């Protein structure tokens, strides 16, 4: 087997590659998401339609492919210091030609250019029922760090019981933490790496949620639904 470099174009750190039955999608921390074109042997940008106001969504925190349909893909996007720290899920059902935008900022927030951005995909589709999708991020204290959809991403709601996985405050558009967490000092104040849901997987009717909570168990398992 021989390995070589593959051109992907300018756009930051490649933080994840997700494969379906055939299609391949890649995410970057500041340069959007890409789909591999087998005919041209190149990676093609999927989020080129974004304007300056929405540049924060070029920070792609996670990708999920519908296990039953490679053309149905979900991109979890957001950046702590651009686009008012909003978090959205872009959904395509035609392989990236068009996208629906679903804003989930009121429930979770993500920072696709933050530390730990390479630590897995924080969104997953149930292979037994692709209308069910789980998604995680950082949240306000006392809120659930895990949300889910039962209608293919049209609507989302918090999953009860996940309110201690991590939290987020956008007071300075960056996660800040209480004294129980390790804190570093920067010119703008104190901060810590993002804390909350880092990765999600669904298999055999179980949803596995990987977290990053200091001093606690970092994998939570529950029945889907």
Q: What are these regions, as identified by a protein language model?
A:
Residues 1-225:
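Extracellular glycan-interacting surfaces
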């Amino acid at each position: 087997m021989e390995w070589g470099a593959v051109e992907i174009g300018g756009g930051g750190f490649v933080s994840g590659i997700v494969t379906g039955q055939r299609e391949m999608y890649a995410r970057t921390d500041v340069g959007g998401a890409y789909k591999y074109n087998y005919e041209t042997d190149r990676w093609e940008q999927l989020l080129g339609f974004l304007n300056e106001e929405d540049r924060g969504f070029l920070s792609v925190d996670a990708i999920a492919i519908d296990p039953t349909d490679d053309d149905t893909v979900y991109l979890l996007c957001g950046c702590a210091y651009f686009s008012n720290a909003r978090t959205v899920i872009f959904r395509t059902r035609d392989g990236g030609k068009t996208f629906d935008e679903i804003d989930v900022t009121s429930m979770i927030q993500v920072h696709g250019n933050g530390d730990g951005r390479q630590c897995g995909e924080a969104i997953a589709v149930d292979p037994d029922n692709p209308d069910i999708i789980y998604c995680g991020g950082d949240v306000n204290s006392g809120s659930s760090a895990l949300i889910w959809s039962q209608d293919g991403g049209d609507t989302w709601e918090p999953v009860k019981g996940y309110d201690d996985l991590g939290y987020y405050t956008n007071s300075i558009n960056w996660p800040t933490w209480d004294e129980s967490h390790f804190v570093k000092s920067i010119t703008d104040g104190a901060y810590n790496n993002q804390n909350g849901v880092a990765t999600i997987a669904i298999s055999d009717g179980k949803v596995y949620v990987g977290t990053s909570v200091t001093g606690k168990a970092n994998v939570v398992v529950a029945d889907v639904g």
